[in-house]
Regions:
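N-terminal, charged low-complexity regulatory/assembly segments
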Residues: 1-85
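Short, cationic low-complexity segments
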Residues: 184, 222-233
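Amphipathic interaction/junction segments at domain boundaries or subunit interfaces
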Residues: 73-168
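Short, charged/polar, Gly/Pro-enriched secondary-structure boundary elements
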Residues: 162-164, 212-219
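A short, structure-level motif marking secondary-structure boundaries and short turns
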Residues: 66-67, 166-169, 224
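Short, hydrophobic/π-rich interface segment
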Residues: 142-201
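C-terminal edge-of-domain segments
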Residues: 196, 202-212
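N-terminal functional module detector in eukaryotic proteins
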Residues: 206-208, 219, 225
Length: 233
């Protein structure tokens, strides 16, 4: 089915990104014979449209930076794929799909080193700018702690549309695969993420970010919980 034929309210919703579509179709090709692939893809498309038919209409559409590649709507598209293809896909595959959407941008920023005060302050400013976008759309409700020299950066979300969507549709089992990319993205900036909760398994999604050489890390070893979330003690 051509994307333009999907029944979406395009005044408030956006289509999955082209990279996301490519990822989903590539995974379908891995699991299904050629004769079935187009049918499966149409099922994913219809599931996506069905999910959005009674979903929030206040997320800003194309104007909201959270709705780009790897963002809220791509997460919904991946959950559509998961819903249709649950019998053949896996947790790691879903995790890989989100990584393939998010990490290319961070790989281009490998020169950033969170261990250095200059880059740490620039990262902090980037998070403050992101909060401005969140305040405009009230999608990911974000709080950023004041900057303190020689201390980790801290911010948190108390609202997450992707998590809200997963809870509503009984898809929380796959949310760890979509959230864990936050760890991988920070690692590409010579940084480490320390997280104890997300909006799916708690009341907030917390981000403590420090350089990968910071002694603070020793106090908060990473582990995977039973659900598959990467977390810290």
């Amino acid at each position: 089915m051509k994307d333009k034929k999907l029944l979406l309210d395009r005044k408030c919703h956006v289509l999955y990104s082209k990279p996301c579509k490519k990822e989903i179709r590539a995974k379908i090709a891995l699991h299904y014979p050629e004769a079935e692939r187009e049918t499966i893809w149409k099922q994913v498309q219809r599931q996506y449209a069905d999910f959005l038919s009674d979903w929030r209409t206040d997320l800003g559409g194309k104007r909201n930076f959270h709705n780009g590649v790897g963002g809220t709507y791509d997460c919904i598209a991946i959950m559509s794929y998961y819903t249709v293809c649950k019998a053949v896909t896996s947790f790691r595959e879903i995790e890989e799909m989100e990584e393939n959407l998010i990490l290319p941008t961070f790989r281009r920023l490998r020169f950033v080193d969170c261990n250095k005060p200059f880059w740490r302050r620039l990262m902090y400013r980037a998070f403050v700018r992101a909060k401005g976008g969140c305040d405009k759309w009230h999608d990911y409700e974000m709080t950023v702690a004041p900057y303190e020299t020689d201390k980790p950066i801290y911010y948190e979300f108390t609202s997450c549309p992707a998590g809200e969507f997963a809870i509503r549709h009984g898809l929380t089992d796959i949310m760890p695969a979509l959230c864990n990319v936050d760890y991988a993205s920070m690692e590409l900036l010579h940084a480490r993420l320390i997280r104890t909760n997300t909006c799916v398994n708690g009341c907030r999604c917390d981000y403590t970010i420090c350089g990968d050489k910071d002694p603070y890390l020793k106090e908060h070893p990473e582990y995977r919980d039973e659900a598959g979330f990467r977390r810290n003690k």
